[in-house]
Every structure is written in C-alpha cells, then in structure tokens.
Amino acid sequence: MGKIIGIDLGTTNSCVAIMDGGKARVLENAEGDRTTPSIIAYTQDGETLVGQPAKRQAVTNPQNTLFAIKRLIGRRFQDEEVQRDIKIMPFKIVGADNGDAWLDVKGQRVAPPQISAEVLKKMKKTAEDYLGEAVTEAVITVPAYFNDAQRQATKDAGRIAGLDVKRIINEPTAAALAYGLDKGQGNRTIAVYDLGGGTFDISIIEIDEVDGEKTFEVLATNGDTHLGGEDFDSRMINYLVAEFKKDQGIDLHNDPLAMQRLKEAAEKAKIELSSAQQTDVNLPYITADATGPKHLNIKVTRAKLESLVEDLVTRSIDPLKVALQDAGLSVSDINDVILVGGQTRMPMVQAKVAEFFGKEPRKDVNPDEAVAVGAAVQGGVLAGEVKDVLLLDVTPLSLGIETMGGVMTSLITKNTTIPTKHSQVFSTAEDNQSAVTIHVVQGERKRAADNKSLGQFNLDGIQNAPRGMPQIEVTFDIDADGILHVSAKDKNSGKEQKITIKASSGLNDEEIEKMVRDAEANAESDRKFEELVQTRNQGDQAAHSTRKQLDEAGDKLPAEDKAPIEAALTELNTALKGEDKAEIEAKIQALMEVSTKLMEFAQQQQAAGGAADAAEGAKKDDDVVDAEFEEVKDSKK
C-alpha cells in the first residue's frame, strides 16, 4: 500500500506532508519552498504554471493568472461576495449554466475544481519526487464551515488531479492533531483559531488520553468562509489606490497591470508591518498619462494598517463566542489557544485573540504547516501507520425534513459528531395517501422555508390506510467527509427510496452565515410560529376526529345536535387558514363544547364492541410523529 499524503489546499498557499518514520514531514517543492502559492497561470503559448512560477509572471499576464480560487468553490455567481470579488479581481468571473461562479480563461469557461486540481497535481508531484514512487491517495483539508457543495467540489478537484481522496477533514481539527500528537499526557481543551487567506474557522476541541489512546473530539465549530488575508490585502490595495488618486488624480482600478503590481506590493507591505512599525510602498512607473510616467511612493504605518482592518479582526470574535456557547464552555475552560493560518502572524490579531481568551496563544505551532501536518497524521491513521489516535469531527448545521405545517423537524442537530446515522418514524397526513415527498432542509430556523432546501424525492406505493397509520422511516446518514445520504422506507411494504445530496444543491457560506444570524435574531418569532403550528395541528386533529365521529353516527344522531357541530366545524376550518393562534384555540374550545352529545354517542358505540380496535389504533398512533409531506418547488436547486 502506497503513502496517503496530507494536503492543505489553501486560499493563498498550499502545503503537502507525509508520515516518515512515525513523524510528519513537510515536503519542499521543486523551487525549494515548504509552501506553494495557490496561483495558476495559463500562458499565451498554452503552458500551465503553478505556484511561484505563476506568481512571478502575474504582472505581465494578470487576466490569465488565477488566485484565491477557494473563495469561489461552491458559490453562486449572484452571491454578494462573488459580485464584490468581480470588482477587485483582475481575472474574469462568469456565471455557469447552473448558476455557479466559474472563470473565463482565454475564452473558455472553467470550473473552480478544475483550477484547484492544478495545485493538487503540484502537491502530488512534490510527494512523488520525494518518495520516488507514484502517489494515488490523499487526505485533503477544508475549512470547518465548508458546506456539502464545497466539500464535494474539493473531492472533485482531487479526483481531477488523479487522487483518491480517502478523507476530507476540517482544517482546525488537522491543526489540533499536529499540536496534540506529541504533547504530554493528560486531558486538555483547546481552541483553534484559524485565519487563513480566504476563510476563518474556530473550533473547540477536547483532547483526551485513556490507556495511551488519544481521542481528539470536536465539541463545536463556527466561522466565516469569506473572511481572510485576501480581505486584509484588499483594504491595503484600496487605501493605496485612493492615496494615489488623491495625489495624481488617476484611478488605478482601471489598469489591470497596475492592480497586479499593487496586489503584490500590498501583500508584501502587510507582511513587513507584522515586524516593522512602518514600510514604504514604492512602485516606479506604475502608470502614465499625457504628462509622462507616474510613480507610486507611499509610507504606510502599522497603526494605519490596523485602522484599515480593525473591523475584519473584530468580525472574527463573534464566532468565538458562539462556538464556546455551543460547546457549553467558558473562556476559563480553555487550556491552550492555537493560531493557524498566515494572517494570524499580524500582531493585532494575536492581541485580540489573547484579549478574548485571557491568555497568550501558543507559539510552538507553525501556522503555515500545522494543517498539512495534521492531514498527514490522519493519512497515517487511515493507512495503519499511526496507532492509538481517534478523531471525532462534527457537522456545522442542523439537518432535517419538512413536516406538517411547514415545520423543519431536525434529525441531526448542529455540532453532532460524524459519521452519524439517525432514523425517525413519520406518517401520512391524509387518509389513503399513496405517496409522500421527502423534502430535505439544512439550517437552524423552525420554518422549513426559511432554511436551505437541499433536495427532495418521492416515496410512492404506500398501501391505502387511514392517516397516521402507515409508518415511514426516514434515515439521515452523514459520512466521515460530512456528506449527507437520505433514505425513506415504508415499514409495511418494505419499499425504500434513497438520495445522496449532490454538490449543486449544497449551501453557500453566505446562506449558512445568514441562517445562523437569522436564527439568533428571530428566536422569538420562531417560537411563536412553532406554537401556532402546534395549535393548528391540534385544531386539525380535532376537526378530523369530530368529522369522522359525525360520519360514523350518520342518521342516529338527531339533526338538532348535528347542526351546531357542523357550524362549529366550519368556523374552526376557517380559523385554521388564518394566523391567529388565540382564534384557533377559541374555535377548538367551542367545538369541544357543542360536541358533548356526539362524544357521548361515540362512547356508547365504543362500549358496544369497538373498544379493542380503538385501543390498538391509539397505540399505533402513539408510535408515530404526525407529519405532512407536500411537494415543494425548489427554485434554488
């Protein structure tokens, strides 16, 4: 069996590591560097360049030099972030036929996974050059807050690169593996703060040691998949452009060549300001007008940079609070804070994190290499090279189905350890219902329509039976990569239908973040909606059972007893169509009051011989959740 390599496929830089003699080793690429820029260039003569060679020629070929592609994976073209990136990226972002964000390279539309595959090929070749043998298997890392679509796209990129992706693992979890593997004994709870080139994650992880076996259990995760070093660079670029326009009256935004030079200079200045208090951005011959060539020379202080990006750093603090709350912990419960990602080298970031946790982050973890090292460790675990290590990761958002009244019924809640499988029995909402539509949704809201529709499928061939009698078992199964499989089975006939949620119907990060924000902001309206639906269901049940008793009574019940019941039923059915909970409750009560004669009649009939059947029916009813499945048009698929 060959080596399973570990790859950190980053927004700005990528890194590859292997297990060598029981230790993780980060490999140097052909240029002699331990990290490779995640930059791909397509030259005029048809050559594809990856890494440093692509970065070096970017100034002369800005429109065909692609970077930060990870920010586009799993995104729709119309996403707010994509539209914002279009304005600042020198290359062309276009809409695909399915609405995804793709790229235009020399007139050809290319999907982000195809471009990311070029970086993965470079990582694969680096490992093969070191090992002297073919490499076909890898563990690849993704941000913890990546959704199903983004995880699928990463696996696709691996497949395009000729790799069998044995496992997708979360970046903070990988960093925890790198940190915790060689540490001493004892149980610890750590916070991994991962601010990379394009994404931000926070994970709270518990490391337990029992009889020599280490368990890495993720307690909670949170993040922002559109926050990273690229955003910090953009603030610096915009500042330099504004200063130059103030000085020279020329807007450099319209000059791709100048913008590419500015991007390089801004990134370099940002890095220098992590160790220096001031730096000069000096770009001679940046542009020209009728009066001759123009030179850019601007002094930037660390204080100025900090004022430009302060809100970005602050944006990373809220997810820390949510993650701690979800884990049921306080700041004092955290033993160690680990910083991952190149952007965490910025002193302001380190200071904010230290201020929040009340302790200095550890300095013995390499922020650029820790994730790749952890991926290699996981590869070693899968290959049997590394013993006594167990990794327990989580799913970032709740998953469920739409049930009666448009409610989302969760089968798997957020921060559940994966892989996981959960089943629940539902039933029909109508008598003799022969088919149901299973509508799968993801998110934290109570109303199914407020969450993301992941997909739907039909289960038909259900045998005729009164409502609430058929037993339909719905099973959600999330694999170790965080990818969802759903099945529905009619327990009576044994008929089953399955679906794997495809990448095209995954969530994009804006939707994830919006769901979490909405769930917090709308907790009260969600509670009221849930109460209204429960009352509606009670009213529906009362109307259904009363109508059934009326029909069974037939002419045996006098007309003067029937008339008020019929009137009360009509009023209740009208109220059920409205949104007034108190009105529905009043009409249920009114129906109960006028139905006393009917109930007495039903009890007499039951005493006459129907008691056994009714008891059996009630028992079956108790074992099922009343649910309604109705076809929902999924316009976002």
UniProtKB/Swiss-Prot annotation:
Phosphothreonine: residues bearing it: 199
InterPro entries tied to this protein: ATPase_NBD, Chaperone_DnaK, Heat_shock_70_CS, HSP70_C_sf, HSP70_peptide-bd_sf, Hsp_70_fam
Gene induction: By stress conditions e.g. heat shock.
Top-rank taxon, per record: Bacteria
Compositionally biased tracts (Low complexity): 603-615
A GO molecular-function descriptor: ATP binding
Family membership: Belongs to the heat shock protein 70 family.
Protein name as annotated: Chaperone protein DnaK
Organism: Erwinia tasmaniensis (strain DSM 17950 / CFBP 7177 / CIP 109463 / NCPPB 4357 / Et1/99)
Gene: dnaK
